[in-house]
Amino acid sequence: MLFSVASLPLSETPLAADVQFAEPSPSATILPGIGRNDDRQPVNPADFPWRALGRVQTALGSRCTGFMVGPRTAITAAHCLFRERTRLIIQPRLIHFLLATSRGAAAGVALVADFTIAPGYDPFHESESAGADWAVLTLSAPLVREGEYLRLDRTLPPRGTPALLGGYSKDHIEIIEADLHCLITEQIRDARGGVLLHHTCHATSGTSGAPLLFRLGSGEWRVAGVQIGSVVDHAGGIAVPAAAIPTSAIGR
């Protein structure tokens, strides 16, 4: 999904006032969320944290990014589970999760057995319910072992937190590309009061569902948020805070 940001809203400013879903100009040559300078670089899918990422792929041809939070549990953006034109839900049996896939080879592949979409997410009113744009996937088989998945952080990261974000972009769908040097800049709100994180990470279409990552002082990687959209015409994007996803939804 795409956002148009006229001016970055402050923490208590409703999302609908300044940040709206928008379509890019047909003549635009700048990728949404990238801008004129592309800071993305390929990363090794065998390295952590990237080996916990995967491509969420439907039989209808749509693709997003997701990440493992348990042996057979993954998270992605809720809008990835709806048909783009009709907004009808896509059945789990039509969705695959390809773990750490790169140039046609994946570390593991599983069907989605079931999924849970966040209460309050409305595919017909995406911008108003953007703070609920997350979903938990239950896979048909375990793809990772204990300790090989990512953990959600339960706090809201402060402004200026160093971050990184990688995923399967539409312009390079066979590899993980990541911006390794970006920042979480603001906490904003959608029209229904849902909290969102604005960041400066270079990421475009296809990365929806990717983890917005930061590192604890101990060196442990944590998920600060779930990427849900890119900013039109320049670098940056919007993520749902990981803290918005209840522990009960992922079973831990």
Where are these regions (language model features)?
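Extracellular/periplasmic catalytic domains that process cell-envelope and extracellular macromolecules
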Residues: A46-P49, M68-V69, L88-Q91, S127-G131, ...
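Chymotrypsin/trypsin-fold serine protease catalytic domain
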Residues: G131, L139-H202
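C-terminal cap/linker of serine protease catalytic domains
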Residues: R145-E148, K170-D171, A224-R252
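Catalytic nucleophile loop of clan PA
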Residues: H202-Q227
